[in-house]
């Protein structure tokens, strides 16, 4: 399942109280299997992330950057918007690093206490992926800049 599909399936299941795994699986089979699941966003963060999913599918760097800026207009703490701007608008590694660091800060604000509570397992949590992509982008960029020790610390 793609990340947008997983996101929309998660939205579909939000607030549901299943009495068993079998009941949950039956719900998923009925509502998701073989279907394109689309659930309207519950707030500005989800709306911005939906714009980011469109940007990730776009082939034009100009369109991707435009959609990233649109996502930031909707929700200024959209970490993936900064990640896309680092990829598409940064003219050098220094500028890319600034975008990734803005993404890290934005993602940390979104995650709040969850950032510390789930440290070490964040890649496994769907809502932490934009933050983790910003962290990975920062580390890769530092490595490319020859700042190896900083890059290693950023990875861990």
Predicted regions and their residues:
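N-terminal alpha-helical interaction modules that lie
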Residues: 1-121, 129, 135, 142-156
